[in-house]
């Protein structure tokens, strides 16, 4: 992979804060941190456009005693077999469950599936976390 050197102008206090944070995180150098930021910027743009294939997780916490939430969750997961790769179910206590659903597919469709799951009655909290499949990243 060919590397290109370029320069940027940045306020000194912003750079000082950036250097402090990347040192705390453990980056070996500024260049690797900048590369990660650029990759993240590209991935977020792909989500907004919605055409690119993404991977991610939909994490939800729900009360399994409330209504038909368990049946609705299972029905939705079976409806999207091509996009839902796997799921992990954890009993948090006697009433609450945590479900982590691994997904892969077109960004728009993954967002739509997450919206459907997160809006189910009985779901207390949830979050979609998307990332790249890695195919297009350098």
Curated annotation (Swiss-Prot):
Cofactor(s) essential for the protein: Ni(2+)
Binding, Ni(2+): 78, 89, 91, 97
Keyword Cell division: no
Disulfide bond residue pairs: none
GO BP field: response to nickel cation
GO MF annotation, one: DNA-binding transcription factor activity
InterPro entries documented for this protein: Acetolactate_synth/TF_NikR_C, ACT-like_dom_sf, Arc_rbn_hlx_hlx, CopG, CopG/NikR_regulator, Ni_resp_reg_NikR, Ribbon_hlx_hlx, TF_NikR_Ni-bd_C
Domain of life: Archaea
Keyword terms of this UniProt record: DNA-binding, Metal-binding, Nickel, Transcription, Transcription regulation
Cofactor binding description: Binds 1 nickel ion per subunit.
Record-stated family: Belongs to the transcriptional regulatory CopG/NikR family.
Protein task: Transcriptional regulator.
Entry-linked PANTHER family: NICKEL-RESPONSIVE REGULATOR
NCBIfam families with a match to the protein in the record: PRK00630.1 (NF001884), PRK01002.1 (NF002169), PRK02967.1 (NF002815), PRK04460.1 (NF003381)
Name of this chain's protein: Putative nickel-responsive regulator
Organism in which the protein naturally occurs: Pyrococcus horikoshii (strain ATCC 700860 / DSM 12428 / JCM 9974 / NBRC 100139 / OT-3)
